[in-house]
Amino acid sequence: MQTNLLKPKTINVEQLGHNRAKVVLEPFERGYGHTLGNALRRVLLSSMVGYAATEVTIAGVLHEYSSIDGVQEDVVNILLNLKGVVFKLHNRDEVTLSLRKDGEGVVTARDIQTPHDVEIINPDHVIANLSQGGKLDMQIKVEKGRGYVPGNVRRYGDESTKSIGRIVLDASFSPVKRVSYAVESARVEQRTDLDKLVVEIETNGAITAEDAVRASAKILVEQLAVFAQLDGGDIASVFDAPAGGRGAATAFDPILLRPVDELELTVRSANCLKAENIYYIGDLIQRTENELLKTPNLGRKSLNEIKEVLASRGLTLGMKLENWPPAGLEKR
Protein backbone atom coordinates (compact mmCIF):
# COMPACT_ATOMS: atom_id res chain seq x y z
CA MET A 1 0.00 0.00 0.00
CA GLN A 2 1.23 3.49 -0.88
CA THR A 3 1.97 5.42 2.35
CA ASN A 4 3.81 8.46 1.02
CA LEU A 5 1.78 11.65 0.79
CA LEU A 6 1.61 13.32 -2.59
CA LYS A 7 3.32 16.67 -2.96
CA PRO A 8 2.78 19.22 -5.74
CA LYS A 9 4.63 18.38 -8.92
CA THR A 10 3.73 21.57 -10.75
CA ILE A 11 3.61 25.20 -9.61
CA ASN A 12 2.20 27.68 -12.10
CA VAL A 13 2.20 31.46 -11.65
CA GLU A 14 -0.22 33.39 -13.86
CA GLN A 15 -0.09 37.19 -13.92
CA LEU A 16 -3.62 38.61 -13.74
CA GLY A 17 -2.74 42.27 -14.03
CA HIS A 18 -0.91 45.00 -12.18
CA ASN A 19 0.42 43.50 -8.91
CA ARG A 20 -2.04 40.58 -9.14
CA ALA A 21 -1.24 36.95 -9.76
CA LYS A 22 -2.68 33.46 -9.46
CA VAL A 23 -0.52 30.66 -8.04
CA VAL A 24 -1.68 27.11 -8.79
CA LEU A 25 -0.23 24.06 -7.01
CA GLU A 26 -1.20 20.43 -7.59
CA PRO A 27 -1.69 17.67 -6.65
CA PHE A 28 -2.35 17.51 -2.91
CA GLU A 29 -3.86 14.69 -0.92
CA ARG A 30 -7.56 15.20 -0.23
CA GLY A 31 -8.07 17.85 2.46
CA TYR A 32 -4.59 19.33 2.22
CA GLY A 33 -5.76 22.04 -0.17
CA HIS A 34 -7.89 23.67 2.53
CA THR A 35 -5.37 22.94 5.28
CA LEU A 36 -2.48 24.64 3.52
CA GLY A 37 -4.53 27.24 1.65
CA ASN A 38 -6.05 28.66 4.82
CA ALA A 39 -2.69 28.67 6.61
CA LEU A 40 -0.99 30.47 3.71
CA ARG A 41 -3.79 33.01 3.47
CA ARG A 42 -3.60 33.91 7.16
CA VAL A 43 0.18 34.26 7.10
CA LEU A 44 0.11 36.32 3.89
CA LEU A 45 -2.37 38.77 5.39
CA SER A 46 -0.89 39.07 8.88
CA SER A 47 2.82 38.33 8.90
CA MET A 48 4.52 39.72 5.81
CA VAL A 49 7.33 42.25 6.20
CA GLY A 50 6.88 45.63 4.53
CA TYR A 51 7.44 49.36 4.89
CA ALA A 52 5.18 52.19 6.01
CA ALA A 53 5.21 55.81 7.16
CA THR A 54 5.13 55.75 10.97
CA GLU A 55 5.77 59.35 12.06
CA VAL A 56 5.22 62.76 10.47
CA THR A 57 6.28 66.28 11.41
CA ILE A 58 4.63 69.14 9.50
CA ALA A 59 5.94 72.69 9.77
CA GLY A 60 3.48 74.87 11.69
CA VAL A 61 1.34 71.94 12.85
CA LEU A 62 1.19 70.86 16.49
CA HIS A 63 -1.36 68.04 16.21
CA GLU A 64 -3.37 66.16 13.60
CA TYR A 65 -6.58 68.11 14.24
CA SER A 66 -5.27 71.17 12.44
CA SER A 67 -5.53 72.87 9.08
CA ILE A 68 -2.85 74.55 6.99
CA ASP A 69 -3.35 77.84 5.18
CA GLY A 70 -3.25 77.35 1.44
CA VAL A 71 -3.75 73.58 1.62
CA GLN A 72 -7.17 72.26 0.60
CA GLU A 73 -6.98 69.12 2.77
CA ASP A 74 -6.87 69.27 6.54
CA VAL A 75 -4.06 67.46 8.35
CA VAL A 76 -6.12 64.31 8.97
CA ASN A 77 -6.75 63.87 5.25
CA ILE A 78 -3.11 64.58 4.42
CA LEU A 79 -2.07 61.81 6.82
CA LEU A 80 -4.63 59.41 5.33
CA ASN A 81 -3.29 60.14 1.85
CA LEU A 82 0.27 59.66 3.08
CA LYS A 83 -0.61 56.18 4.32
CA GLY A 84 -1.38 55.26 0.73
CA VAL A 85 2.19 55.87 -0.42
CA VAL A 86 4.03 52.58 -0.96
CA PHE A 87 7.69 52.66 0.09
CA LYS A 88 10.45 50.12 -0.42
CA LEU A 89 13.75 50.37 1.46
CA HIS A 90 16.88 48.61 0.29
CA ASN A 91 19.42 47.48 2.90
CA ARG A 92 18.04 49.66 5.69
CA ASP A 93 15.31 49.40 8.32
CA GLU A 94 14.24 53.04 8.62
CA VAL A 95 14.73 56.42 6.99
CA THR A 96 13.49 60.00 7.42
CA LEU A 97 12.38 61.68 4.19
CA SER A 98 11.56 65.30 3.36
CA LEU A 99 8.73 66.77 1.33
CA ARG A 100 8.79 70.49 0.54
CA LYS A 101 6.55 72.19 -2.00
CA ASP A 102 5.02 75.63 -2.35
CA GLY A 103 2.82 77.34 -4.87
CA GLU A 104 -0.43 76.25 -6.45
CA GLY A 105 -0.57 72.65 -7.61
CA VAL A 106 -0.89 69.00 -6.68
CA VAL A 107 1.49 67.38 -4.18
CA THR A 108 2.22 63.76 -5.09
CA ALA A 109 4.50 61.06 -3.73
CA ARG A 110 6.95 62.01 -6.48
CA ASP A 111 7.66 65.23 -4.55
CA ILE A 112 9.14 63.27 -1.63
CA GLN A 113 12.93 63.54 -1.69
CA THR A 114 14.43 60.05 -1.57
CA PRO A 115 18.02 58.74 -1.43
CA HIS A 116 19.21 56.10 -3.88
CA ASP A 117 18.24 53.18 -1.63
CA VAL A 118 14.62 54.23 -1.10
CA GLU A 119 12.00 53.52 -3.75
CA ILE A 120 8.45 54.85 -4.07
CA ILE A 121 6.28 52.33 -5.89
CA ASN A 122 3.35 54.67 -6.65
CA PRO A 123 4.91 58.10 -7.30
CA ASP A 124 1.68 59.54 -8.77
CA HIS A 125 -0.29 59.01 -5.55
CA VAL A 126 -1.85 62.34 -4.47
CA ILE A 127 -0.99 63.61 -0.99
CA ALA A 128 -2.47 67.13 -1.01
CA ASN A 129 -3.59 70.05 -3.18
CA LEU A 130 -2.07 73.50 -2.70
CA SER A 131 -3.83 76.77 -3.44
CA GLN A 132 -2.05 79.95 -4.48
CA GLY A 133 0.40 80.88 -1.76
CA GLY A 134 0.13 77.45 -0.15
CA LYS A 135 3.15 75.64 1.27
CA LEU A 136 3.72 72.14 2.62
CA ASP A 137 6.88 71.20 4.51
CA MET A 138 7.03 67.84 6.27
CA GLN A 139 9.40 65.18 7.55
CA ILE A 140 8.28 61.57 7.11
CA LYS A 141 9.75 58.65 9.02
CA VAL A 142 9.47 55.32 7.17
CA GLU A 143 10.18 52.05 8.97
CA LYS A 144 10.35 48.36 8.23
CA GLY A 145 7.83 46.25 10.08
CA ARG A 146 5.40 43.37 10.04
CA GLY A 147 1.61 43.30 10.04
CA TYR A 148 -0.35 46.19 11.54
CA VAL A 149 0.84 48.35 14.44
CA PRO A 150 -1.58 50.93 15.93
CA GLY A 151 -0.13 54.36 16.56
CA ASN A 152 -1.16 54.39 20.23
CA VAL A 153 1.01 51.32 20.88
CA ARG A 154 4.09 53.09 19.57
CA ARG A 155 3.10 56.48 21.02
CA TYR A 156 3.23 55.25 24.60
CA GLY A 157 6.07 52.82 24.14
CA ASP A 158 8.65 55.18 22.64
CA GLU A 159 9.83 58.26 24.50
CA SER A 160 11.21 59.77 21.28
CA THR A 161 7.68 60.18 19.88
CA LYS A 162 6.53 62.47 22.70
CA SER A 163 8.03 65.67 21.29
CA ILE A 164 5.54 68.39 20.37
CA GLY A 165 4.47 68.36 16.75
CA ARG A 166 5.45 64.76 16.02
CA ILE A 167 2.43 62.83 14.82
CA VAL A 168 2.48 59.05 15.21
CA LEU A 169 0.59 57.06 12.57
CA ASP A 170 -1.11 53.70 12.56
CA ALA A 171 1.20 51.62 10.37
CA SER A 172 0.04 48.89 8.01
CA PHE A 173 3.32 47.31 6.95
CA SER A 174 1.87 44.37 5.05
CA PRO A 175 2.60 44.55 1.30
CA VAL A 176 -0.23 42.08 0.64
CA LYS A 177 -3.60 43.73 -0.01
CA ARG A 178 -5.86 40.79 -0.80
CA VAL A 179 -5.62 36.99 -0.73
CA SER A 180 -8.18 34.38 -1.66
CA TYR A 181 -7.87 30.68 -2.29
CA ALA A 182 -9.97 27.96 -3.86
CA VAL A 183 -9.63 24.20 -3.86
CA GLU A 184 -10.45 22.38 -7.07
CA SER A 185 -10.33 18.74 -8.09
CA ALA A 186 -7.12 17.21 -9.38
CA ARG A 187 -6.33 13.85 -10.91
CA VAL A 188 -3.24 11.66 -10.95
CA GLU A 189 -3.55 8.48 -13.00
CA GLN A 190 -6.59 6.64 -11.58
CA ARG A 191 -6.95 8.82 -8.48
CA THR A 192 -9.61 11.51 -8.82
CA ASP A 193 -10.02 12.54 -5.18
CA LEU A 194 -7.01 14.89 -5.04
CA ASP A 195 -6.85 18.65 -4.45
CA LYS A 196 -5.61 21.52 -6.58
CA LEU A 197 -4.88 24.71 -4.64
CA VAL A 198 -5.45 28.04 -6.41
CA VAL A 199 -4.25 31.14 -4.55
CA GLU A 200 -4.97 34.63 -5.88
CA ILE A 201 -2.84 37.43 -4.45
CA GLU A 202 -2.80 41.19 -4.87
CA THR A 203 0.14 43.16 -3.48
CA ASN A 204 0.96 46.86 -3.29
CA GLY A 205 3.90 46.41 -5.66
CA ALA A 206 6.63 46.30 -3.03
CA ILE A 207 6.83 42.51 -3.44
CA THR A 208 5.76 40.12 -6.18
CA ALA A 209 3.02 37.58 -5.56
CA GLU A 210 5.47 34.72 -6.10
CA ASP A 211 7.92 36.10 -3.53
CA ALA A 212 5.05 36.65 -1.10
CA VAL A 213 4.01 32.99 -1.31
CA ARG A 214 7.63 31.92 -0.89
CA ALA A 215 8.09 34.13 2.19
CA SER A 216 4.83 33.00 3.80
CA ALA A 217 5.71 29.34 3.25
CA LYS A 218 9.10 29.94 4.86
CA ILE A 219 7.39 31.44 7.92
CA LEU A 220 5.11 28.40 8.22
CA VAL A 221 8.04 25.98 7.89
CA GLU A 222 9.98 27.81 10.61
CA GLN A 223 6.99 27.80 12.97
CA LEU A 224 6.06 24.15 12.37
CA ALA A 225 9.68 23.02 12.71
CA VAL A 226 9.34 23.61 16.46
CA PHE A 227 6.92 20.68 16.70
CA ALA A 228 9.48 18.39 15.10
CA GLN A 229 11.73 18.99 18.12
CA LEU A 230 9.26 17.70 20.70
CA ASP A 231 10.90 15.47 23.32
CA GLY A 232 14.30 16.74 22.25
CA GLY A 233 14.04 15.27 18.77
CA ASP A 234 16.22 16.60 15.99
CA ILE A 235 14.41 18.20 13.06
CA ALA A 236 16.65 16.42 10.57
CA SER A 237 15.64 13.03 11.99
CA VAL A 238 12.00 13.61 11.08
CA PHE A 239 12.63 13.39 7.37
CA ASP A 240 14.24 9.93 7.49
CA ALA A 241 16.59 10.88 4.67
CA PRO A 242 19.17 8.20 3.87
CA ALA A 243 22.71 9.27 4.71
CA GLY A 244 24.49 10.69 1.70
CA GLY A 245 21.32 10.49 -0.40
CA ARG A 246 19.46 13.16 -2.26
CA GLY A 247 17.12 13.58 0.71
CA ALA A 248 19.91 15.27 2.67
CA ALA A 249 19.12 18.47 0.81
CA THR A 250 15.72 18.74 2.58
CA ALA A 251 17.48 20.21 5.63
CA PHE A 252 18.09 23.40 3.64
CA ASP A 253 15.66 26.08 2.54
CA PRO A 254 14.70 25.13 -1.06
CA ILE A 255 15.68 28.58 -2.30
CA LEU A 256 19.31 27.84 -1.36
CA LEU A 257 19.31 24.88 -3.74
CA ARG A 258 18.32 27.00 -6.72
CA PRO A 259 20.90 28.11 -9.31
CA VAL A 260 22.07 31.72 -9.17
CA ASP A 261 20.67 32.14 -12.70
CA GLU A 262 17.21 32.39 -11.10
CA LEU A 263 18.27 35.62 -9.37
CA GLU A 264 18.13 37.28 -12.81
CA LEU A 265 21.36 39.21 -12.29
CA THR A 266 22.98 41.18 -15.07
CA VAL A 267 25.13 39.14 -17.46
CA ARG A 268 28.30 40.70 -16.05
CA SER A 269 27.47 39.77 -12.44
CA ALA A 270 26.32 36.26 -13.38
CA ASN A 271 29.51 35.54 -15.35
CA CYS A 272 31.69 36.79 -12.49
CA LEU A 273 29.97 34.41 -10.06
CA LYS A 274 30.30 31.42 -12.37
CA ALA A 275 34.00 32.20 -12.81
CA GLU A 276 34.32 31.76 -9.03
CA ASN A 277 32.41 28.43 -9.11
CA ILE A 278 29.35 30.00 -7.47
CA TYR A 279 26.48 28.07 -9.04
CA TYR A 280 23.84 27.91 -6.32
CA ILE A 281 22.29 30.57 -4.10
CA GLY A 282 23.59 28.59 -1.12
CA ASP A 283 27.12 29.03 -2.50
CA LEU A 284 26.61 32.77 -2.92
CA ILE A 285 25.28 33.73 0.51
CA GLN A 286 28.31 32.19 2.22
CA ARG A 287 30.64 34.65 0.49
CA THR A 288 31.42 37.95 2.22
CA GLU A 289 31.44 41.36 0.56
CA ASN A 290 35.23 41.49 0.69
CA GLU A 291 35.52 38.09 -0.94
CA LEU A 292 33.23 39.09 -3.79
CA LEU A 293 35.01 42.40 -4.34
CA LYS A 294 38.21 40.43 -4.95
CA THR A 295 36.49 38.69 -7.86
CA PRO A 296 37.89 39.94 -11.20
CA ASN A 297 35.54 42.37 -13.01
CA LEU A 298 33.04 42.45 -10.14
CA GLY A 299 32.81 45.98 -8.77
CA ARG A 300 30.80 47.83 -6.17
CA LYS A 301 27.83 48.31 -8.53
CA SER A 302 27.55 44.56 -9.17
CA LEU A 303 27.96 43.88 -5.44
CA ASN A 304 25.08 46.23 -4.58
CA GLU A 305 22.94 44.53 -7.21
CA ILE A 306 23.63 41.12 -5.65
CA LYS A 307 22.89 42.41 -2.14
CA GLU A 308 19.57 43.93 -3.21
CA VAL A 309 18.43 40.78 -5.00
CA LEU A 310 19.31 38.64 -1.97
CA ALA A 311 17.63 41.07 0.43
CA SER A 312 14.39 40.83 -1.56
CA ARG A 313 14.40 37.12 -0.72
CA GLY A 314 15.30 37.57 2.95
CA LEU A 315 18.96 36.60 2.46
CA THR A 316 22.29 38.35 3.00
CA LEU A 317 25.94 37.78 2.24
CA GLY A 318 28.19 36.25 4.89
CA MET A 319 25.67 33.68 6.13
CA LYS A 320 26.94 30.40 7.56
CA LEU A 321 25.58 27.07 6.37
CA GLU A 322 26.56 23.87 8.13
CA ASN A 323 27.08 20.74 6.01
CA TRP A 324 27.01 22.67 2.73
CA PRO A 325 26.86 21.51 0.02
CA PRO A 326 24.31 18.80 0.78
CA ALA A 327 25.10 15.33 -0.45
CA GLY A 328 23.60 14.64 -3.84
CA LEU A 329 23.56 18.27 -4.99
CA GLU A 330 24.36 18.24 -8.67
CA LYS A 331 27.72 19.76 -9.50
CA ARG A 332 27.81 21.98 -12.56
Swiss-Prot record:
Cite the record's note on assembly.
Homodimer. The RNAP catalytic core consists of 2 alpha, 1 beta, 1 beta' and 1 omega subunit. When a sigma factor is associated with the core the holoenzyme is formed, which can initiate transcription.
Per the record, the GO terms for biological process are: DNA-templated transcription
Protein's job: DNA-dependent RNA polymerase catalyzes the transcription of DNA into RNA using the four ribonucleoside triphosphates as substrates.
Q: Where is this region: Alpha C-terminal domain (alpha-CTD)?
A: 252-332
Broad class of enzyme this protein falls into: transferase
Q: Which domain of life is it from?
A: Bacteria
CC annotations in GO: cytoplasm; DNA-directed RNA polymerase complex
Q: What is this protein called?
A: DNA-directed RNA polymerase subunit alpha
Give the record's family classification.
Answer: Belongs to the RNA polymerase alpha chain family.
The record's region (Alpha N-terminal domain (alpha-NTD)) falls at: 1-231
For molecular function, the Gene Ontology terms on record are: DNA binding; DNA-directed RNA polymerase activity; protein dimerization activity
Q: Quick one: which gene encodes this?
A: rpoA
Q: What is known of its domains?
A: The N-terminal domain is essential for RNAP assembly and basal transcription, whereas the C-terminal domain is involved in interaction with transcriptional regulators and with upstream promoter elements.
Against InterPro entries, the record matches this protein to: DNA-dir_RNA_pol_insert (IPR011262), DNA-dir_RNA_pol_RpoA/D/Rpb3 (IPR011263), DNA-dir_RpoA (IPR011773), RBP11-like (IPR036603), RNAP_asu_C (IPR011260), RNApol_insert_sf (IPR036643)
Q: Does the keyword Transcription apply?
A: yes
EC assignment = 2.7.7.6
Please write the reaction equations for the catalytic activity of this protein. Answer: RNA(n) + a ribonucleoside 5'-triphosphate = RNA(n+1) + diphosphate
* Alphabetical UniProt keywords: DNA-directed RNA polymerase, Nucleotidyltransferase, Transcription, Transferase
